[in-house]
Amino acid sequence: MKYCGNRIYACCMGRSQILCMDDEFELLHTIGRKGRAAGELMDPSSFDIDGDTVAVLCYGVFKHYTLDGEFVGVTDIGLSLPNKDFAWSNGRYFYTSGDQGPIISMSADGTIRSFGERYRFGTEEETRYRNARFTLAYRDRIITVSDNLPYIEIFDRQTLKSERKVDYSDVDLVVQIMKKNVSERLAVNQYRALVTDCNISDGRLYVLLADNLDKFRANKIIVFDIEHDCRPVSILQLPGERYFSFCVNGQNIYAFNLRENTFEKMTMCYE
């Protein structure tokens, strides 16, 4: 989910559309329609907004639309398929790919640069799968959040050089979750996620945790101050049990409750 210009944008995979809603979740219009034609979408997996344009990842291409839903064009990704959410900023795409490097920067003409640290695991196959990261653009930085390790990295958007790596494994809740995740033996191409979604608003990074301690929950958000040292400043407790995606504006959180199949608007409540 994204908040942009007093509107909420959400990817509806079942309808193969991007929904545009007001802040009370009234549907204003949709972007794309289900199909395989150039201006249509089939199983979109993620999207991002830069300026007045929406980029949607769909079957190995980025499809572009105006915020009002008019189709603009297509950019082919080639073989470097994203394995998590991507960021789109100033005509460049940023994402993680198990095939071509830890993090990819791709220009509109298809020029690719890889950057960042590749996290190492027991086998090459496990390393390939577990390097997935959420990728976000914020001002002149690219921020990545591992989906299974307590790591946040901040890069200069132009030089792609690392500015900071944050390890938040000392947060009590994260200590408990990681201990449980490590104790479970899974196939090399499977792992327990630590993070289910991320969002940036007003200089703060919001990270939605996957809590598998007694039963699966995704209802706690760690807040990081990215304007200073990017350390955790608070934990937010959401009222439901399992949220899939969310966005933030001011003191409001807009989230999709996966268990209830509903959109919810709530005011921040600190644990």
State what each model feature region is.
Residues 29-39, 112-128, 163-190, 236-240:
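Surface-exposed loop and turn segments in beta-propeller and other repeat-based domains
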Residues 10-14, 56-60, 95-99, 144-147, ...:
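Conserved beta-strand positions in repeat-built beta-propeller and related beta-rich domains
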